[in-house]
């Protein structure tokens, strides 16, 4: 189970990814942002948050829309 702080991190990452996508940022810029988020929290968070962040990364790689419902 994710803590409230971890949910905030995930929600903020998803919002930023969707914003970058709306602004037509390059896929590799978005991937760099997600990778930096993963690096920042990697040693200090639950496995569930890491799994969700890697799922976000995978959706960016595949070019799919990142859904807000992922956090549930």
Model-derived regions, located:
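Residue-level detector of intrinsically disordered terminal segments
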Residues: 1, 69-71
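N-terminal acidic leader/helix
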Residues: 1-32
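Short, charge-rich amphipathic interface segments used for partner binding and complex assembly
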Residues: 28-69
């Amino acid at each position: 189970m994710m803590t409230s702080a971890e949910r905030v991190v995930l929600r903020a990452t998803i919002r930023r990814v969707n914003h970058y996508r709306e602004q037509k940022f390059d896929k590799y810029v978005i991937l760099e942002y997600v990778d930096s988020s993963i690096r920042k929290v990697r040693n200090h968070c639950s496995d569930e948050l890491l799994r969700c962040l890697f799922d976000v990364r995978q959706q960016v790689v595949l070019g799919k829309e990142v859904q807000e419902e992922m956090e549930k």
